[in-house]
C-alpha cells in the first residue's frame, strides 16, 4: 500500500466515525438521511430513491440516487464519506444486470420498476424459524 492509499484509509476511518455504511449496489432502493442547515437550525432530511450508479474509489467514492418527486425525476449525487450524510439505509435490494442504470431516465411508470432480489431459501428459513 502506498502512502496515498494509507492516507485515504485513515481519512475514511475518521470520517465514518461510529456510523456504518451498508453494502449496497445499483438497483437498490436507499433511504439517505442528509443533514440540512437552515439558518441556525440543523435537521435531518430523508431522501429515498433508487441507486442508479456508484462511482469513484476510496475516499472519493460517490453514489447517485434517483426518485420521482411530483411527477419529475430528481437525481442527487452523494459523496459516500461526506459528513453531511448522516445515515444510509437499504430499503430493498433490486435485481439488475448493469452497473449504471442511466436508462431509467427515459422510462416512465411501471416500465421504470426494478424487480426485487429474492433471498436464498436457507436465509429465509433461518429468519422464519427464529
Curated annotation (Swiss-Prot):
Biological process according to GO: translation
InterPro entries reported in the protein's UniProt record: Ribosomal_bL19 (IPR001857), Ribosomal_bL19_CS (IPR018257), Ribosomal_bL19_sf (IPR038657), Translation_prot_SH3-like_sf (IPR008991)
Keywords: Ribonucleoprotein, Ribosomal protein
TM helices/strands, residue ranges: none
Protein name according to UniProt: Large ribosomal subunit protein bL19
Gene source species: Parvibaculum lavamentivorans (strain DS-1 / DSM 13023 / NCIMB 13966)
Gene Ontology MF terms in the entry: structural constituent of ribosome
Cellular component GO terms, alphabetical: cytosolic large ribosomal subunit
Cell membrane is among the record's keywords: no
Tagged with keyword Cell membrane: no
Function of the molecule: This protein is located at the 30S-50S ribosomal subunit interface and may play a role in the structure and function of the aminoacyl-tRNA binding site.
SUPFAM superfamilies the record matches: Translation proteins SH3-like domain
HAMAP family for the chain: Ribosomal_bL19
Amino acid at each position: 500500500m502506498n502512502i496515498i492509499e494509507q492516507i485515504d484509509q485513515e481519512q475514511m476511518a475518521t470520517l465514518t466515525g461510529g456510523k456504518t455504511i451498508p453494502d449496497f449496489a445499483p438497483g437498490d432502493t436507499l433511504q439517505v438521511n442528509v443533514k440540512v442547515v437552515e439558518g441556525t437550525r440543523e435537521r435531518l432530511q430523508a431522501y429515498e430513491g433508487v441507486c442508479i450508479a456508484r462511482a469513484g474509489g476510496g475516499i472519493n467514492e460517490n453514489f447517485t440516487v434517483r426518485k420521482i418527486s411530483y411527477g419529475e425525476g430528481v437525481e442527487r449525487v452523494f459523496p459516500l464519506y461526506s459528513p453531511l450524510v448522516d445515515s444510509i439505509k437499504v430499503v430493498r435490494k433490486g435485481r439488475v444486470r448493469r452497473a449504471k442504470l442511466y436508462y431509467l431516465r427515459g422510462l416512465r411508470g411501471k416500465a421504470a420498476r426494478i424487480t426485487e432480489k429474492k433471498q436464498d431459501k436457507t436465509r429465509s428459513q433461518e429468519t422464519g424459524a427464529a
